[in-house]
Amino acid sequence: MSRLQQVTVLGATGSVGLSSLDVIARHPDRYQVFALTGFTRMSELLALCVRHAPRFAVVPEAAAARTLQDDLRAAGLATQVLVGEEGLCQVSADAEVDTVVAAIVGAAGLRPTLAAVDAGKKILLANKEALVMSGALFMQAVRKSGAVLLPLDSEHNAIFQCMPGDYARGLSQVGVRRILLTASGGPFRKTPLAELEQVSPDQACAHPNWSMGRKISVDSASMMNKGLELIEACWLFDARPDQVEVVIHPQSVIHSLVDYVDGSVLAQLGNPDMRTPIANALAWPERIDSGVAPLDLFAVARLDFEAPDEQRFPCLRLARQAAEAGNSAPAMLNAANEVAVAAFLERRIRFPQIASIIEDVLALEPVVTVSDLGAVFEADTKARALAEQWLNRNVR
């Protein structure tokens, strides 16, 4: 009998983490959960530990760790609880771990994901901020360690599936003309512009096709999510920003396309369910059952496409500008967006002010060369401070 693949799931209580665990549980003959991590949903993390019996669990604070450890013992589990970023990095780099699902949302996921990279793991990357913030450094570390990097975003996984196996030689070398990154357009695609001032966090989080966490749902509504994915695609596939085009596709059936110089366009289709890209990346280069229902083309009936309106979605324009500027600009973009989205979810600002905060931060802070991780976090810290200053000036 072959050895079970040991899997660490960073961000286990989030939507991607839960979908990953669903796929893993379908294949007990292949995979075993090594570690689970959570941030705020401690009762959910406990339930996941009871179900999957990991070797380790990681939580952010010592008090939460003590409570969880007591609860695990009461449940008869030997799971050891670790604390903080050090614990995250430990379960990402442990010698027994084969695969790391990097699904922590935001900048907090960067260090543990890099720990997995440096340890040469197979990394299923859902944390887009890791590449957005430190793309050049991140990809350099991947090449140095020999880590296997597989995208979990449905769009990037679709691109990966449509690319030739030797795409790392360069897009022009393998005949790729451009990448077409699809977007649903979110819940406000047809909302009159004047009404965007009044939309609520709950409305922003009501995605028409996907079930996601609140932060990424707001990013989808503003199309910042697609802007971050554009930056991520540039690093994953060594593309220039002008080689990545965003296309609105409301049905979310085509997850992305690759346009070749001979006139061929390859697309990956499927029901909008994260378990498809997770299963693809988890078993690559093989295929396994994901639990996702087959796509019914007769029920889909039609596929629509339209160009994104940058007046409606200024965050997409800002992200493209950051991609073109490079260096510290994407890290600042991401940091300002995280602060702005948190303020919107707390009802401190209106929806259009998310883009206003980001644009002002990018205008105030000059782009600097990023040569190490310290410079990345310095840019992140400065941008967060400027965004908070904006809130202090403009929010009563």
UniProtKB/Swiss-Prot annotation:
Gene3D superfamilies: 1.10.1740.10, NAD(P)-binding Rossmann-like Domain. One of its GO terms (molecular function) is NADPH binding. 1-deoxy-D-xylulose 5-phosphate binds at K128, S154, E155, S184, H207, S220, N225, K226, E229. Disulfide bonds: none annotated. One of its GO terms (biological process) is isopentenyl diphosphate biosynthetic process, methylerythritol 4-phosphate pathway involved in terpenoid biosynthetic process. It holds the Pfam family DXP_redisom_C. Its EC number is 1.1.1.267. Coiled coil: none annotated. Transmembrane segments: none annotated. Pathway: Isoprenoid biosynthesis; isopentenyl diphosphate biosynthesis via DXP pathway; isopentenyl diphosphate from 1-deoxy-D-xylulose 5-phosphate: step 1/6. The keyword Ribonucleoprotein does not apply. It catalyses: 2-C-methyl-D-erythritol 4-phosphate + NADP(+) = 1-deoxy-D-xylulose 5-phosphate + NADPH + H(+). NADPH binds at T13, G14, S15, V16, N127, E129, G213. Keywords: Isoprene biosynthesis, Manganese, Metal-binding, NADP, Oxidoreductase. Mn(2+) binds at D153, E155, E229. Its cofactor is Mg(2+); Mn(2+). It is an enzyme of class 1 (oxidoreductase). Catalyzes the NADPH-dependent rearrangement and reduction of 1-deoxy-D-xylulose-5-phosphate (DXP) to 2-C-methyl-D-erythritol 4-phosphate (MEP). Belongs to the DXR family. This is 1-deoxy-D-xylulose 5-phosphate reductoisomerase. The lineage of its organism: Bacteria, Pseudomonadati, Pseudomonadota, Gammaproteobacteria, Pseudomonadales. The gene is dxr.
